[in-house]
Amino acid sequence: MEFLDLGPFSRASGTIRLPGSKSISNRVLLLAALAEGETTITNLLDSDDTRVMLDALEKLGVRLKRDGDTCVVTGTRGAFTARTADLFLGNAGTAVRPLTAALAVNGGDYRIHGVPRMHERPIGDLVDGLRQLGAKIDYEENEGYPPLRIRPGQINADAPITVRGDVSSQFLTSLLMTLPLVRTGSGVSTVQVDGELISKPYIEITLKLMERFGIKVERHGWHQFVVPAGQRYQSPGSIMVEGDASSASYFLAAGALGGGPLKVEGVGRASIQGDVGFADALIRMGANLQMGDDWIEVRGVGHDSGKLEPIDMDCNLIPDAAMTIAVAALFADGATTLRNIASWRVKETDRLAAMATELRKVGAKVKEGEDFIIIEPPEKLIPNAAIDTYDDHRMAMCFSLVSLGGVPVRINDPKCVGKTFPDYFERFIALAQP
């Protein structure tokens, strides 16, 4: 197995410009493909997950012109021209879920599959919602999981659709993005959310991007979403993808742990991503942090001890960036508790179990619950821990921060960061100093 040895480092400073957001990149690609007109997308993320989406769109007949981080998409006016396709989508949830929904109403014969882990990630609640529209979707192997076979159905949105909100917000995102493509005799298409909706900021991203493409969605609290009929996706002409706020979290934490000043460009107060809320968590932990509209700068910790303060936090709104808090908790002056993170279990790996296992390798005492984790930092970090990454980009990036504790750390399978940030380690090493 490939590995990368990092550190020991004691400082981190400099400036980094973030790659584009994965969540925004794949949403914008699909919306541009479904729109009327040509869309120029800039600062598009180049990663495994976006390549999977681009390849799928090309197979579906979408015309794309790529040049570096710019992509020009010629829209299909709401209907893909390819009526049959076999789509391998890797482990990209941001491609599998929305494409499943869009293809379910497209009137063709499609197969959607991915890596073995993708076939363990639930999709049943989305399929149930799409079947309420008349979609014909079959499971090829296990009920509730990919691979999927999609066939033409009698599609309409006359009756409200109900979808669970407590497993993944991507199910609701996928339905909302698809409803403008579906005819309705009632004048509106309605989605009812059953139970507590998790990861609400990701729904905010979806609604704001749909609006950029000409679709207004009426939100009634977090339990009902109404799409008035007669709307069609229209290209905004051009759209820039803001920096990835989840990826920002590693560098912001590095600025706190390594003294800074470390400036992250590409996200800030004007961001539409919920994970920018990680900055508030860092401030609660004692970091010296300043923020502009599209930048954030961290200058170490405001305590004489140089240690972060432990926190007890509900992480429902920042599930991905919360992983960074878990590793930063190794540098806190007491036990940190992260709550409401059940969604970790259905991500690229079971992140709760993986996080607990790897934190223990560097000396932490960890209590892992169904939807929480408690991290008690060690007196001294254990050097030369070999961190397993579970083919999960965020596990690899999070644990790079251990090297800022003055100990070397080994990251196994470092290339898994290709999912969202292929040159992450080069960028991290450029900012870290012994």
Curated annotation (Swiss-Prot):
PROSITE patterns associated with the record: EPSP_SYNTHASE_1, EPSP_SYNTHASE_2
Catalytic residues (positions): D320
CDD domains per UniProt: EPSP_synthase (cd01556)
Pathway: Metabolic intermediate biosynthesis; chorismate biosynthesis; chorismate from D-erythrose 4-phosphate and phosphoenolpyruvate: step 6/7
Compartment list: Cytoplasm
A GO molecular-function annotation: 3-phosphoshikimate 1-carboxyvinyltransferase activity
Source organism superkingdom: Bacteria
Cellular component aspect of the GO annotation: cytoplasm
GO biological process: amino acid biosynthetic process; aromatic amino acid family biosynthetic process; chorismate biosynthetic process
Record NCBIfam families: aroA
Xref: HAMAP family: EPSP_synth (MF_00210)
Protein task: Catalyzes the transfer of the enolpyruvyl moiety of phosphoenolpyruvate (PEP) to the 5-hydroxyl of shikimate-3-phosphate (S3P) to produce enolpyruvyl shikimate-3-phosphate and inorganic phosphate.
UniProt cross-references to PANTHER family, sorted A to Z: AROM/DEHYDROQUINATE SYNTHASE, PENTAFUNCTIONAL AROM POLYPEPTIDE
Subunit structure as annotated in this protein's UniProt entry: Monomer.
Family: Belongs to the EPSP synthase family.
Name listed for the protein in its UniProt record: 3-phosphoshikimate 1-carboxyvinyltransferase
